[in-house]
Amino acid sequence: MTPLHPARSTLHRRSVLAALLSVAAGVARAGDDGEPAGPLRIVVAYPPGGVSDAIARALAAELAPRLGVPVQVENRPGAGGAIALRSLARAKADGRLLVFSAVTPLALDPQLRVGPAAEGIRGGPPPAVAPVAGVMLTPSLLVGTPAFRGRSVADLLAIARERPGGLRWATSGIATTGHLVLEQIRVAGGIVVTHIPYKGGGQQLSDALAGQFELLSTNVGALQLRYVRSGRFKALAVGAPQRVPQLPDVPTLAELGFPQANLASRFGLFAPAGTPPARLRRLNGAVDAALQQPAIRGALLEAGSLPMGGSAEAFADEIARSNAEIARAWPSASRMPVN
């Protein structure tokens, strides 16, 4: 190895020392202003390969420079998002761990709720979590796979009545919005179907394309839209306040006579309860700013979702609205079994 020139060696030592002092100063500043040192972790409550995972990773890339720390993303799927959310109860409330999830488990998972079921489900966020920011509102989508020989919800009902239990209906898991949609149509339509709960993500779509079941309750997303446009999926209905622009010919479930099943999914970021208010405000501001960026907004709109944003208080209000919708759709939802 060629030895360093003395002058270069001195410069090298000074550069290393300056870098170390800079890091130390950064850590000191983090402690002085109440900001935790170290990377931020975002746990996505769903498997890799889905819309939620893609949006969470795009958001992480925008948050890192705004917060001045690395942002790491990992996946912890299961129980429709409840497993990741439950982990917040065991986490240190320093604002270094966030969970990206739909809000549905906050109403449906008994481990996240406290108090009387009716009171809890109609209220806002449960005490186990602190809302940070709303990220997106995603319409639900009911599709027929290549194995489905009908072309409409009317056909679905007719086939199910002809062959009780013969239609296999997949969702992203028990106690998800898709499961609620299934149950509402099942009860209102007086039919029997076979529920196949997944953990969400790419495997569910792969099996759908392979025709391993006839029906899929999912969310509007870029891949789903691609498969509908190519004819591989038959779009039967959407759950949204009005028809979605990407699928203007597909009716809402309310139009088809299933208003209680006309549900969309709200997704956002959550921190452990007890996270310092100043840290929550900092995180909320960074998320809200990131959602204004063209890259993020474009990715959301391409996926068929609407950006949310706004304050943590506004997100808490959205959670309360979602809980009220679920309470109306399924009065016994808080007693619903969760994986």
PLM region descriptions:
Residues A30-P127, G166, I174, I191-S217, ...:
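N-terminal (or domain-start) structured segment
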Residues A37-L40, R279-N339:
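An extracytoplasmic/periplasmic, membrane-proximal ligand-sensing/linker region
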Residues M1-L11, S15-A25:
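N-terminal secretory signal peptides
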Residues L223-L291, A324, V338-N339:
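C-terminal lobe and pocket-closing loops
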Residues R90-R96, P110-Q203, L253, R266-A299:
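Hinge/capping helix and adjacent helix->loop/strand transition within the periplasmic-binding protein
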Residues T104-G115, Q184-A188, L215-V250:
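A ligand-binding cleft/hinge motif common to bilobed small-molecule-binding domains
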Residues V99-P105, T171, G201, S217-Q224, ...:
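Beta->alpha turn/N-cap motifs
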